[in-house]
Regions:
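Alpha/beta catalytic cores of nucleotide-metabolism and tRNA/nucleoside-modifying enzymes
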Residues: 1-14, 79, 96, 113-114, ...
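Non-catalytic, usually N-terminal nucleic-acid engagement modules in DNA/RNA processing proteins
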Residues: 1-109
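Intrinsically disordered, low-complexity regions enriched in small/polar residues
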Residues: 5-6, 48, 57, 64, ...
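Short, acidic/turn-prone active-site loops that include or flank metal/cofactor-
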Residues: 26-28, 44-47, 153-157, 206-213
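Short, charged, surface-exposed secondary-structure boundary motifs
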Residues: 31-33, 49-53, 135, 159-163, ...
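Eukaryote-skewed repeat-based solenoidal scaffolds used as protein-protein interaction platforms
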Residues: 67-203
């Protein structure tokens, strides 16, 4: 499993010297390039949808941001702009899970036409119940090519219940065993679960920041991020027989 540690400051990427996740929200006002190795560009979906009730800008704005920062380091993927399906997010938008799933696909379709083909645009599967994720796989149809690296959204609130997260991932794998899954915002409890890790190709997390703040340390210290990433890497389980397939 590839782990991307989430960072508050893009400038910390060079210090951490590990695969990292940087939000587009941290780059909007930035002018200069930043040093980084492997990284993911986060779409800032939580801020937009959960707080503002939807995207304040059209997809062309995010596409321009992806193109602007793709030259920094080795950008593995720009995450597509999805619509989360947790109950509190649905309460904010007033829409249903099915509506959020349709909006997620529509946004992906729009971005595919705008993001340069040299940048991998990661599609995101949404839902809340396992069967809803399976339905979203079907709705994507041929958009999800064989072996595609695909995000599993709305799983971060299940971190305290790894079995629930694993059930979602298994439902997706049952529908499309070839997909290489990425978990957003995973916490230690979930990442420590072999049931979860064996289903994932990759994951990201900023749990280090919350933990540092809760324990009275600096929640913005890059050394906290580096230590957290080292801890995750140290939990690598025995190689799964499926890992070679997912790595192809």
């Amino acid at each position: 499993m590839i782990f991307y540690v989430g960072l508050h400051q893009p400038s910390d990427a060079a210090r951490v010297a590990r695969p990292c996740m940087v939000s587009v929200n941290r780059l909007r006002g930035r002018r200069s390039d930043f040093a980084v190795g492997r990284w993911l560009l986060d779409s800032g979906a939580f801020t937009e949808v959960a707080i503002h009730g939807g995207y304040r800008d059209g997809p062309e704005v995010y596409a321009r941001q992806a193109a602007r920062w793709a030259g920094c380091g080795a950008l593995d993927a720009a995450v597509s702009q999805d619509y989360m399906c947790e109950p509190f997010v649905l309460a904010r938008t007033g829409l249903s899970v099915a509506a959020h799933q349709a909006l997620t696909i529509a946004r992906y379709d729009a971005l595919r036409l705008l993001v340069p083909p040299s940048i991998y645009l990661m599609p995101v599967l949404q839902g809340y119940l396992p069967e809803q994720y399976a339905a979203h796989v079907a709705a994507y149809g041929a958009r999800l090519r064989p072996g595609m690296w695909t995000g599993a959204g709305s799983v971060c609130k299940r971190n305290g219940r790894p079995g629930d997260m694993a059930a979602v991932l298994r439902a997706i794998k049952a529908a499309r065993p070839d997909l290489r899954l990425h978990a957003f915002g995973a916490k230690l409890t979930a990442l420590h679960s072999a049931d979860v890790r064996e289903l994932l190709h990759s994951a990201d997390s900023m749990a280090w920041s919350y933990s540092a703040r809760k324990q009275g340390r600096d929640a913005n210290d890059w050394r906290e991020a580096a230590a957290f990433a080292s801890r995750i890497d140290g939990w690598r389980p025995a190689r799964s027989p499926m890992e070679d397939l997912w790595s192809n």
